[in-house]
Amino acid sequence: MTEAEALTSRLNAVERDRKHKNIRPSDAATLLILDRTAGGPVRVLMGKRHMRHRFFPGAFVFPGGKVDPADSRVRLADDYHPQVLAKLMHEMRGPKTVARARAFGVAALRETYEEAGIFIGVPRGDAVPAAGVSFAGFAEAGVQPQLAPFRLVARAITPPNRPRRFDTRFLACWATAIAGRTPDGLGPSGELEDVAWLTFEEAKKTELPAITFTILDEVANRLSRDPALDPATPVPFYRWRGKGFERMLV
């Protein structure tokens, strides 16, 4: 069995609840913040979902969520690397615009603040408040959101006939992009009970959604071959074709 077959077979094994009315996937984004400053293996920021959630209660996840319409109108300190932008726009559903591509990164850093209390951006005491209530915290912290540190590491679309469907871009950045944190180390949304920096092996021993486990494997494999996360490196794109997942490289 090839590496690609092993990764897709795990996802296929859990996709049995497909009896719901088909819905259009919502755009979503998530962020893997990677830390290699402490020595030893790379660690990734993970959060434990609150037990009150109906969707994966108690599971460990990366910060992230749906893209909001206002995410495409946020004032940014800088832009993606051109090759990252090109990958984000590959086979984009609906209007294929740079503003929509930027919204993925903005959603990822917004959700990271809301859930984990971490600001990704450029410290600027005179930062202009960005659009949207969620970015008031950035303005108060004197941080302007930025996209330059982000690398696309995967994309996945939930199969048809699932109760919830997302077209998710998985972005990554190094912990050196962190410009600040909330005092209590948690975000204002209350969606996560706890956050922790885990090695990939530690993370895979927690309760994880299948796609999260798969992305951990994908990123671990990439780091072994591409430790600098070169923006030109092809990234996996998972989507449902016929009776199972297809994994292609973008």
Regions found by a protein language model. Give the residues of each.
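N-terminal leader/linker segments that precede catalytic domains of diphosphate-processing enzymes
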Residues: 1-250
